[in-house]
Amino acid sequence: MNDSFMKEKPVLPLILSMALPMVVSMLVNSLYNIVDSFFVAQISEQAMTALSLVYPVQNLINAVAIGFGVGINAVIAYHLGARQQENASVAATHGTALSALHGLVLTAVCIPLMPWFLGMFTDDRTVIELGSQYAGIAFSFSVVIMVSLSFEKIYQAVGRMKETMLALLSGCITNIVLDPMLIFGIGPFPQMGIRGAALATGIGQVVTLVIYLVIYRTVKLPLRLGRSYLRPNPRLDKKLYAIGIPATLNLALPSLLISALNAMLAAFSQAYVVILGIYYKLQTFLYLPASGIIQGMRPLIGYNFGAGEHRRVRSIYDVTLGLCAVIMAAGTAICFVFAGPLMAMFTDNPETISLGETALRIISLGFIPSAVSVASSGALEGLGKGTQSFVISLFRYALVILPVAFVLSRIFGAVGVWHAFWITELVTAAVSLIVYRKSVRQ
């Protein structure tokens, strides 16, 4: 790691140099869900409904992977900033081993529970069967996902963003190529339907992990993974989980939110469940540029905090917030202008498209204020203040939106649920500023 690069380069160019490879890779990586949804929608609306209902559990698995990865990233960046290379290597090794363990547990738990979980939201046996088929294959790759994410966060912590971009792009391109072949049986491949979508995604994730391993063997890094670093270290493991657990909960809360909103919307029509599922696919794509900025910002804040550069930490936060606000403004404009075509990518049902246009335009009103909570939460994670970051997410994904959505849905119907989104973002933005400013003064 270049010390002058992290501590002396002007903040805006520094953030962009760290974040742009992540923005590109995450935008392309978001195509995993977009491409799956696009091709699955061509099977049937029942298949699309199944994919929408599986999404919260899929998001939960990703939340564990990314959330614990945030802990790995923050601890490594801090120790490198403090010039403690051996501690950084221990954190990387323990983080990777624990990530693999998390993957094994999630595979064993999630696959058997899927038929029961899907039955909570629909009594359509075809939807339950399709969802179970997809989950059974997709969730079998949980260990691969966990280990890949640990390597991703390790590379980000040491400033190797281009290597991360290469690995993610390789996996995503593999998924895009294989999806139609495995779903529809093109060329030598059998027609697998929704199972083909899951298998294509899994193979893409394996390709990403293989690229990470090859890079690790060929590129010199300021830390190493090894058996000698696996010796028990409860203090360091506690640090990993102290940041990783709140970060995981931050990312898992949307899964609980989606399930709760699905239950509210299903009372009106299954079309609204499909619309919510489509929105979250699109939201992933629209929010990912901001997420890429946050990914680039976290190690910078952690490194400079570890080096005692507190004024530079404040500057990094301010620039990140401004960049996120610009991205969110662009997302709002896209949803207002192209709401119809965006919905039509995933369904040809005129009623669903019409209802979805209204939903997208209403929900997108909250994009710009959401920049405050996104930037504040990411900065707090980079500073190692995972609990404070979780407080922001708790407001955003549970304490405000659920009661507001429940009340408004009783008054205005399903449209009330859409209005709950922007109301929540305004309230959470105010809470985020208070929590962040109070935390950095401590």
Enumerate the language-model features and the residues they cover.
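Hydrophobic transmembrane alpha-helices of multi-pass small-molecule transporters
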Residues: 60-63, 107, 175-180, 209-213, ...
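Short alpha-helical transmembrane segments in multi-pass integral membrane proteins
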Residues: 1-19, 76-143, 189-245, 301-366, ...
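N-terminal transmembrane alpha-helices
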Residues: 6-38, 42-43, 59-71, 75, ...
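Residue-level hotspots within the lipid-embedded alpha helices of multi-pass solute transporters
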Residues: 26-30, 63, 103, 107, ...
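Helix-terminus/linker motif at the lipid-water interface of multi-pass membrane proteins
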Residues: 27, 31-49, 118-125, 181-192, ...
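Transmembrane helical elements of multi-pass membrane transporters/channels
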Residues: 17-36, 137, 171, 204-208, ...
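Short runs within selected transmembrane alpha-helices of multi-pass transporters and secretion channels
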Residues: 69, 73, 138-156, 164-172, ...
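Small-residue-rich hydrophobic transmembrane alpha-helices
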Residues: 48-108, 112, 145-159, 163-164, ...
